[in-house]
Structures are given as structure tokens and as C-alpha cells.
């Protein structure tokens, strides 16, 4: 195990989530060129990524710290703090402990596991628990975790994908001589190794388990075997599969499909005996194997050329081979021993149940023709006909080729006639054989006739029929100019090779040896169908339907796909979106061929799968390439990163990112924009900056373009400050930044409402005599006006000649309330002959409304009516708000009529909603009824916003019945009320004493799954129940809502009330709930709980809460401090009281005089005068006077006990005691 776990993973995913739940720590340097540190993997899912926080005020772009916490010097309190919002009820008790016992760690682990099962706890918290686990291991020599704690910890680590940490835990256990006996944990760890494509570690861990006598689960066997088959690890797959069959001797614990894959893999590697052993064991267990497994073993024997054992196997298992298997065997026999012996073997197969078809005889025909035995080939053809089969075109082609090869071309017409009689269409391959054969026989007239016939069938173009002989030569594969048919004019015909019908002596003017070699080669290749070459040709031509059809035919003809054909076919299939899934199925069907693909093809497959979004398959091939050390192209890395940003988890993305960095990956500049966009959306801003640095350095001639693209992407996605920091750094290094970059920064910063930064960039541009673009100016000018920088806005507007700039100025001045300037600007605009926009009237209308200039409002409104300019919704909202507050609601209603003329129904609802809202705000709810009647008359249906306004408005107007009625109507329509509406109705019901209806309402919300985490509503219901004395009902209600996840953010008031009434259990439960919800309770909550515990003399629990309270930064009240001090004194634990007072002083608090006196009196009772005197000194330093009786009593105790203690040299106890300036004599 130690050897296994010490193996460093080849590509370890780094751990990103070392972040506290309350604070984030950042620490990476700007433009750091170091690659991200690898650490343990974490499962973060295809969740929506939350971009990391970055500060823009510094040149240092900061990221989360990826370093693990150094446990040296870490206190238990620090470590427990990270878990205080997960299991506060447990961590609270351990805060005051100097260390942890094994039982404590187990309790903490059990509590954490329980919370983890409820969900909502991520990797960060598991890492925090792991750090406590590690801290406990080293707190003192000899500490040993309990086995159950180790199991729980390992299980949680595996669940979060923290594999490295699990390995460390197991190594630690083995050092202590312990062994984990939970098979499930090891199986889960093997599963993680498989997920990370680390089959080596998975197999080693499996072997270790078996040596320890542990039996993996069925699912573990299955996933491990499937992975080993995928990576073609035959020996390991067989060994584990055999162990599975022998160990799990029950069929319901085995997956026959997985075992079948192993058998196929064994047969592919010619390990047929091992495959047969597996099959026998399955049969011995009573398993009825399907024919596919027997087929695989049979083909394995065939590949091994062990035909005797093949027959023996078939006879033993009584397997009847199908035509695919039988034809495969027959094809191999023909190639190895010839067609005659193959036929004899076929007859033996027939006796064992094999049923041949026309292709079976076609294989025999082809090989007979290849061997030159045309007679037997024709006999086989006759046998096909006699059995009622229809001969295949390849069989006829074989016979035609055989006849031509033997010089029997005169008999070919009989074959052609038979083909026609059987209704077989002559194909291009048949015509090509005929042309080639006639060219071989020097029957060129016949060859011309065939070419003309091909034209009749539409197989060649008309232009090629003009010279049919040249076309015939082209079909054979000759260059027509290199082969000429010439007449021998010599009277002796010395050159004549043959004669035409007219008796002319003719000869071929060409290289006769090459001619004969070519025609013979074509005829030889036509004897047996060469499916591999046909598939390659169809794939390269893009005819994938034909290629796939040939692939199916190939299997029937018993031929195997070659590596080259597979590679070409896969590339073509991947390039076609319609056939992409076919390529995936072929990869799974032929794992051995997939394993043998070359690096270039694998790179191509990854790129195409990524383009089509098949990230899982691209990831599988990528890991295979890494394991086989294939070179990975830059384009492949780019495709993977882009695809994983969209489809895979953050860890998968970072894994590829790390590998790309190690390979010095550099994307093409054209891909950078898309990459930066994807990475930023995934939250990897640090990686974006790193990539930009590399691109910027690597493309010196395109640095301006790279900077522009980088800044554009970051500003669009909301990271303008990061982009600005990068640009400032580049400027500091002497780089020249284009003006367009500044424009992108300005737009981004304005969009992010960081106006001051945008103004700073504007100043920089103006200093450099640069003028912002029109788009930048339109965003800057209104903001400058609102920021009281109208002068700069005017100066900027003068630089741009556009009517849009005038609108921007008017808008900015209007929104800033500078209406006189806006009017002057409008006059200038009109005097320059520029037409005004409808928007200008709307913004001025809004400006006059804000300034309460009603005369101007009416003037602009009249102008808008005359010009038929529709008032915008925003303008109407400003107007109706002012009118309803005046109150002049009739004016608002009148304007609404004008506005509705240009609005669709949804717009009408918005307008009515605004009118209802502001009428309620103006306490004019009677007019609301009229508005509702009007809406009903016009057929305008109220939406969710309307109902919410009505519910809250009527409630605020004390019309509770109407409020409840509209709430009920809203719920009945399936609309979810907002918190404000629910709060208003619940409060009114509770105030009127009808808490039952409030509870019923809450149950309705709960039944619909509406999570309304309103603390006010819950508090109101609970407080009402408590005031009515119905404490059990209040507790049941709170327990139910917290259990169902409907937590309110704050329960402080309820906690205080329950604690005061002595219901501490539910009060503590609510306090814990708040902490789990990452909401820190108020000091009053802790004070009330502590005081309640003190009333029941539960001092230890009270101190637990007190310690937690202080560590959370809360200040206990004086009464809480005092109560603890008094209770500890009463319990004869005065040293604890003393410690509390000192702690209080250390925190800057002032203990009361009564607290000091209580502690001093207790020390006096215990005759501990030294401590008493120390308390008196502290009391005096806090400004309190010690009375004479206390002093004298202490002196008397000192004298009677003869306790003498020298303090400072030459100073007695009495003088030291009475030297405080706070002492006064009684008069």
C-alpha cells in the first residue's frame, strides 16, 4: 500500500478552495509566469462559475491562495473556526480544549458526516475537517485515530475528489499497523482513479485489497474492468475478471456484458484459452451465455489460426456460428490453405449448425478465381442458384475477372446475360472489369462498345464518349496520351500484334510490360473485393453512406478493417456532424484499432469532438494520448480548453490547463479572444492574465492587437479593473497602448459604475491629445454632468461633431438638475439645424419633475402631446410619483390615458402598477379601487407585481380583509407573493390575534415549495405564539421550518424570548441554525442563552457559548460577565472567575466593582490572600476604591496565617497594600 500511495500522479489536479467561509486570502503576483501549482483534485461540478475577487487598486492581481495551511503553530481554535458554521454544537465544546482525543475527532467526524448528507457543504469545509484530522495526528506522540473516524474521513475526502489526501490517510494508517476494512471506501477510491484515467493505481489498489482479503463490490469490478478494456490492458482485465467470477460466485453479482468485453479483448490479443476459461467458469455458475460471447471466442481461434480447436470448441458448447462468423473463418481458411480445403472445412461447420448464404459461396468463388480455378468457381455459382440464393455482384465480378485472366473473354457475355436475367444492375466496377479485360485481350472494339454502354447507363459524361478508346484507357488507369493504338503500315506487318475487322495490322505504342502489369493488377484486385481500399476511397470522397455500407458488407465477407482504413474513416466521420455519433460507436466497438490510431488522427478526433461539444469523448482520447506519449498539438489544447470551459468541471479544465502549460502551449492569436472569453466566464481570471502575458511576449508583431482583444473581453465581462491594471503595467514598461484600448476601458468602467476610474482614463487620454470615441463620449458625458464636471463634459462635446453628443449633454444636465443649462444646450442644438429626438423631451420632462418645476412640466408635456411623442415609462414613473404626493392623482391618471395609446398590454400593466403603487404611498387607496375597475373594463390582467402592490398597499391602509383577499387570489393563480406582501399579511393577522390563519398561510407556502426565508414573518408568528403561551406550537413551527430548509436569516429576537422563558433547547437550535446559515447571531442572543444556562447552573455549557461568542468578535454584556463570575464563585471555582475578569480586562472591558468584590471575598474565604491582593491591585487599576474593611480583613488573614511574602525590596505587605491611590480613610 505504501508503494502504491507514494506514486505521484502524472497530472494532479490542483486544489483551489482553501478559502475560509468568511474571508478570502489572495496572493499571486502580477504577470507570474509560473504554472499553477498542482494539488489534490476537488469536485466542483458544471456549476455556474463564480469569478474570483480581485482588487484593482494595486498592480498585484490577486488570487486565492493555493497553498495548504501550515499546521505548525496552528491552534485548535483556529482550525475549529472554519467548521463553526457546519457543526457549531460540537465545535463549541472543543474550543476550550487544549487538544483532542480520538473520541473527540470521531464525534466531530460523525456530526460533519450527518450535515454533509443534508447537502450544501462543499470542498472547502471537508478540507477544513481534514486539517483538524491532520492536526490531531501530530498534537502528541502516540495519538491514534479510531478506525471509524478514519473511515468517515476517507469517505468524505473521496466524495469531494480529494484523492491525494485519502492516500495520505491510508499511508498514515498503515504506518500505525492499521488496515481499513471498509471495502466501499477502497472501491470508491478505485472509482476516482478510473475517473482520473489512472488505471495503474486502480489495479495496484485492487491487488492490495485482494491480498488483504477484501472483496470489491460488483460495481467496482465493473467500472475497473470497463476502464481496463478501454485502455487495452488485457492481462490486468483478465486477471480481475477471473477474480470476479471466482469470488462472486452468484450470477446476480456479475455483469455479463463487461465480462464479454474482456473475452473479446482476450481474443483480439489471441489469448483464446484464457477467454475459454472465463466462459467455462460462467457456464459452471449456471450462466447461459449468449451467442455473442461464443462468437468472440470463435473469432479468437480464427485469428490464432487454430482451426482444430475452433471446431472442438464449437462442438463442445454446441454453438451454431452465424454467417458473419462462418464467413470470417472461411475467408481466413481460403487465404491460409486455399479454397478447396476451405470448402471441406465449411462442410464440417455445416454439420455443427453453420448455415451458409450467397456471400459464403461468393468468398469461395473469389478465391477460386484468384487461384485460377474457374471451373470450380462456376460450380459454386451454380450451387448458389440451386439453393435459391441470389449471387452477389462481387461473385460475378470475380468470375468475369477470372475469365479475362485466363484469356476466356469470349465467355464473358454468358455471365453478363445471366446477370441481366437475375435483374442485377451492372455497376461501375463490373464495367471497369469488362473494359480492362478487353484491353488485355486487345479487343478494343469491344472496349469501345462497353464505354458507349456506360454512357447509356449514365456512368460517364457525354464528352468522354467522343473518344471511347481513350476513355477506356483512362478507366483502366492509363494516361490516354501514353497509350496509343497505331496501324502497322509495313507490308510484312512486323509490328502488328493483332488485326481489326478490316484486316489492318495494329499495335500498341506504349510500354508493353507496364501495360500488361497494369491490366493484370486491375483484374487481380477485382477477383476479391478489397473493401479496405473501397472504404478509404469513399471516405476520402466524402461519400460516408457508401463507406458505412461497405463497412457492413465487409463484415459479411469475413474481412477485417485495416488500421489505415479505420483512421481515414474516423477522420471523415468526425468531420461530419451527421455521422459523429457513428464514429463514437466505432471507437467503442473496436478498442484495439482505436488504441492503434496515430497521434495525428487522435489530435484530429479531439479537435472535432470538441467542436461538436462531445467533451467526454475528447477527454477520454486526450488522456489516452497522454498515457501513450503522443504529441498534442496547440490547436488540440485550444479546442480542449474551449470545450471544457463550457461542458466539463473546473477540475477537468485545470487539468488540461496544467498539461498545456507544461507543453508550452501557445494558442493562435485568432483564438485568444474566444479563449479569454471562456476562461473569464469560468472564473479563471488569473489564468487569463497568465495567458495574455505569454501571447503578448510570443507575438511581438501583434502586441497591439493582443492587448486590444484582451481588454475588450475583460471589460465586456465585468473585469475592467483587471484590464486597467494590466494596461497601466504595460505603460509602465514602455509599451504603446492604442486609443481603442482606452475606449474599451472607459466603456467597461462606466458599465461597472466605476466612474472615477473612467474619468481618470479620460484625463490620461486628454493629456495625450487623444479624443475618446463617440460611444465612449456618450457614456462619459451624462456621468460627468452628474459628478459636477459639466465643464469637462462641454469640452468633450465640442470635440465630437454629432447630434448624439448634444442629447448626451442634455440628458446629463437634466439628470443633474441643471435644467437651465439643458435648455440652453437644446437651443444650441436646434439653432445648428439639428433635429431633436423624442428621448430629449423625455429626459427634460424627468428633469423638470425632479426639480418640481410644474410649469415647465406642463409645457413639455403639451409639446410632447402636440408632437405625438409618447411619454416613456420612466418619465411617467417620475411624474406619477410627484403627482400622487402633491396630491394631484387626476393629472397622473390623465397622463396615463395618453401614455396607454402607444403601449401594448404588458406596457399597460406596468403603467397601472406604477399608478397603484404611488396612490397607495399617497394614502389614496379609494382611487385604487377605481383604477382596478378601469383595468378590468379594459381587459388588462393584473400580474404578480400588481398583486404584491395590492396586498401590501391595502395592508398598510389597514384594509386587512382586502389584503388577505388579494393574497389568496394571487396564490390561487399560482403566483408567489414576495416577502413584503407575506410580511404585511402575517403581521396584520398576528396583530389581530388570528395566528391560526397565519400558520395556515405558511403551510400553503410550504406545500408549494416556496422558500420564503423572511425572519420577520417567522419571528412574528413565533412571538405571537409565545405571547399566547403556546410554547409547544412555537417550538414545533420553528423545528419544521428549519428542518425543511426555510431558514430565516435572523432569529435573534426569538432566541432571546425563548431563552428568557427557559426554552433553551429550541433557542440553542435556532442559534446553531443561524451559524449553519453563515449568519452570526447578535450579542443579545448569546447573552440570553448564557444567562438561561446559568439559571440552570450549566456552567460548562455557558462557558462554551461565552468562548464562542468572544471568538466571533461579539462583546458579552456586563450582566453576562458578572453572571459567569458569580456562578463560578458559587461553584467554588474562583480561579475561573479570576480568569474571566482578566480576560475581560484584556478585551478592553471594565469589570464591575461587585465582580471584583465577589472574587476577592471568595479568595478570602479560601484564605488565598496572594490572589486576593492581586485582585485588589487590578481593581484599583480599573479605578475602583477598596474599602478599609476589605483591606483590614485581608491583613488579619495574613497575620493569623503568618503568611509573609516579600514583594519589592524594603517594602512590607501592609505598605504595598495601602499604597494604592484609591484608598481613603473612613470618616
UniProtKB/Swiss-Prot annotation:
PPR repeat positions: 146-180, 182-216, 217-251, 255-289, 290-320, 322-356, 357-391, 392-426, 427-461, 527-561, 562-597, 598-632, 633-667, 668-698, 703-737, 738-772, 773-800, 802-836, 837-871, 872-906, 908-942, 943-977, 978-1012, 1014-1044, 1047-1081, 1082-1116, 1117-1151, 1152-1186
Keyword Transit peptide: yes
Keyword Metal-binding: no
InterPro entries, A to Z: Pentatricopeptide_rpt, PPR_P_subfamily, TPR-like_helical_dom_sf
Location in the cell: Mitochondrion
Domain of life: Eukaryota
GO CC terms in record: mitochondrion
Residue span of the annotated presequence: 1-31
Key words, A-Z: Mitochondrion, Repeat, Transit peptide
Family: Belongs to the PPR family. P subfamily.
Protein name in the entry: Pentatricopeptide repeat-containing protein At5g15280, mitochondrial
